[in-house]
Amino acid sequence: MAVVLAVTLAVPATMAQTEKQTQNVYTVAGVAVDNTAETAATAREQAIVEGHRLAFNRLIARLVPADQRGNIDRPTQSDIVPLVLSYEIEEEKRSSVRYLGMLKFRFRRGEVRAFLQSKGINFAETRSKRVLVLPVYEYAGALLLWDDPNPWLVAWNEVPPSDGLMPLRLPVGDLADIRDISAKQAAAGNAGQLALVAERYGASAVLVAKASVNVEPGTNKRSLGVTTRYFGGTSADRTTVRSFDYSDEDTDETVIRRAAQQISVQVEDDWKQENLLRFDRLNSLVADISLTELRQWVEMREQLRQIAYLQRWQLVSVTRRNASVRLTYYGDAEQLRVALAQRDIVLEQGAVNWSLRESRDARSEPAPQRADEEVPR
């Protein structure tokens, strides 16, 4: 009689419980596999093959906009293996016929780029800084945020966490949150209170998502209207209005849940679309950096190595007080500016040259770790 393996692996938490982030864009962690075969060795072998496929799919979902992913044929194992730098087993359990594991994959950036470019697929690599979502629900003329019930906040809490390029964070809803900002202040875009709660959560921006159920007079046709607006960050003041219609079977709860899920996906996809790497557009600029000590240049240099848009950078001159660098980058200067901002670096255009400096309002959020493969200089 076969031994039954009873084990519980880590279950993905909700957005409110955890902010799942990989160490860098080309690392895919927490890949769960569960395979049964005639022997444990065979089950393990099959599980690792399956893990390669699952990790590749997650990487593609992370980098490639939704409208492009359908253009990628399902790859074979022989297609995927050359793209993998390494993999490791984070945890595993096995019986005589079953294998369960949690795997972590590191992909080769250069090879993945070449793979996607060969298929004409556009993709992004820039990870946004953390964004705090405040779901405000309007009901019977009242604005709800921390109130119970707030079905809109509940729906956002049920959205699975994303390990994509746009890390969204939901507030806990504790006394500090209630003290810092009210539903009315969030809906009105009170800059001071929004900045206060954003700083406490280490967020670079706040996305206020206001929802209300609308009923069309005469027909009683129902829809959920949602307005989202960014406060702070590189997308400040961007506003989007969407409407979600009800079917005959829909309830408020089902439509609200669907809207939260779709908007979270759309927010991620919008970020990717705005930060696509344009390999066919190569530009350059010279930027000056004011220095008070050499350590600043060393830190700036390490940050520049992590910017996906940079094809290379070249030190033009350096003194005890100043440095000048030539940045050769893909796309336009605005995309480069946004990418640098995610690393707390400000790019500004001066009378002659551009300038680079550390952001004065850098959050306490730690910068993403270094990628497995650095951008060539």
Briefly describe each language-model feature range.
Residues 2-10:
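Bacterial N-terminal signal peptides
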Residues 234-253, 258-262, 271, 275, ...:
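C-terminal soluble interaction/assembly domains
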Residues 27-30, 109-111, 201-252, 335-337, ...:
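Amphipathic beta-strand/beta-sheet edge segments enriched in Tyr/Trp
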Residues 33-76, 193, 254-266, 295-306:
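Short, well-ordered alpha-helical segments
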Residues 48-72, 127-129, 133-190, 300, ...:
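N-terminal segment of the mature soluble domain
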Residues 12-16:
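Sec/Tat signal peptide C-region and signal peptidase I cleavage site
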